[in-house]
Amino acid sequence: GKINNIPFFCTCGVGFDAFVSLKFADSGKRGLLTYLENTLHESLTYQPETYEIENEEGTVKYKAFLIACGNASQYRNNAYITPHSSLANGLIDITIMEPFTVLDVPSLSFQLFNKTLDQNSRIKTMRAKKIKIHRQHDGVMHFDGDPLMAGKELEVEIIPAGLQVIASPEKRSK
């Protein structure tokens, strides 16, 4: 897929995950522990934003903690943010995580790693070939976890069969 004409393979998005990606990139240290430290620290002060999401069917408005767009289902470390994404269906799966309380964290965390996040009442989902995300302020977005500052308007689209793989004849599946 592409977000603002930048290619991504698995996921892209805006909101908390993009913000943490930026903090993680600036931290100078790598690894799961550093990522978790950044996540916990930033979750104490992060403020959800209001977004409009426009697709082929119309426009919806959400106050969201994050919006994740998935071509594939997994963030990393077996966390499934768009659990029903498929690399083969030509569609982007969109997960909108609405604001939540500390009491929601255990179930959200369990469902994130159990491929059932879409069953949580704080989660809204949709599928589309292309979406536009409108937000009130410039901010960070991410593509496969790499942060980048971007404007108020974001465009996400899928590139059907966009990944070409070269393999030797004996390695090809039949």
Feature names for model-found ranges:
Residues 1, 20, 67, 94, ...:
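A residue-level signal for conserved active-site and pocket-lining positions in enzyme catalytic cores
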Residues 1-65:
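Catalytic core of DAGKc-family lipid kinases
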Residues 3, 21-23, 69, 97, ...:
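Short beta-strand-to-turn element immediately C-terminal to the catalytic PLP-Schiff-base lysine
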Residues 13, 17, 68-83, 147:
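Glycine-rich phosphate/pyrophosphate-binding beta-alpha loops
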Residues 17-20, 61-63, 75-78, 102-105:
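Short acidic/glycine-rich loop or secondary-structure boundary segments that cap or lie
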Residues 26-34, 83-103:
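Gly/Ser/Thr-rich active-site loops/lids in small-molecule metabolic enzymes
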Residues 36-40, 49-56, 77-82, 117-119, ...:
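Glycine-rich, charged/polar anion/phosphate-binding loops
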Residues 55-57, 61, 86, 96-174:
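ATP/nucleoside-binding phosphotransfer catalytic cores, i.e., glycine-rich phosphate-binding loops
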